[in-house]
């Protein structure tokens, strides 16, 4: 269920020692579904699958259409976790604005690693139905170009913003 090295000697591992799942694999999708449903049953209202993408390396083998594989995996995961009803939300962390959420799904796209200069372009390329509600940028800076959409920043960035507000009010 993983991505194989080009030599076919075994599973490919990234530079941080992590193996990547093959999103087209039924076994990988089943394992992810089980993990998501376990979290859902524990009472979590949202699960975000980070790094929902293929690695940027040419050291592994994948001969299929990567975007189609991700799109199909996304649809299967949304359907198998019943994210189209109730209050549970299954979301995806990616840097690919072309991934499309299925109609009626309770889901969001969390854009990872998007430069502030590309925020509007990324949002414009996205095909989600409700961009204000279904796009979330994971930002590491206080750049205001992210603020037209939902944005999550590290606590240190939020503390800096609050300190700047306090300085302005004094």
Q: Where in this protein do the model-derived segments appear?
A:
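Substrate-binding cleft of secreted/luminal carbohydrate-active enzymes
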Residues: 107-170
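Extracytoplasmic/secreted proteins, especially bacterial periplasmic and envelope-associated proteins
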Residues: 27-35, 43, 69-76
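Aromatic-lined carbohydrate-recognition surfaces of secreted/lumenal glycan-active proteins
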Residues: 48-50, 68-100, 136-138
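Substrate-binding cleft/loops of secretory-pathway carbohydrate-active enzymes
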Residues: 88-119
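Active-site-adjacent "subsite" loops/lids of carbohydrate-active enzymes
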Residues: 1-37
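Active-site-proximal loop/short-helix segments
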Residues: 4-7, 45-71
């Amino acid at each position: 269920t993983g991505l194989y090295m080009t030599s076919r000697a075994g599973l490919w591992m990234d530079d941080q020692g992590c193996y990547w799942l093959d999103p087209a694999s039924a076994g990988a999708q089943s394992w992810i579904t089980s993990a998501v449903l376990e979290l859902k049953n524990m009472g979590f209202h949202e699960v975000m699958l980070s790094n929902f993408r293929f690695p940027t390396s040419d050291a592994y083998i994948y001969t299929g259409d990567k975007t189609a594989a991700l799109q199909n995996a996304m649809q299967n995961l949304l359907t198998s976790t019943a994210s189209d009803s109730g209050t549970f939300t299954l979301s995806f962390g990616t840097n690919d604005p072309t991934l499309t959420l299925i109609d009626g799904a309770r889901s969001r796209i969390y854009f990872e690693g998007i430069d502030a200069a590309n925020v509007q372009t990324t949002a414009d390329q996205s095909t989600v139905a409700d961009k204000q509600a279904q796009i979330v940028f994971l930002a590491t800076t206080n750049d205001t170009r992210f603020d037209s959409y939902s944005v999550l920043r590290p606590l240190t960035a939020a503390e800096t913003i609050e300190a700047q507000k306090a300085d302005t009010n004094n």
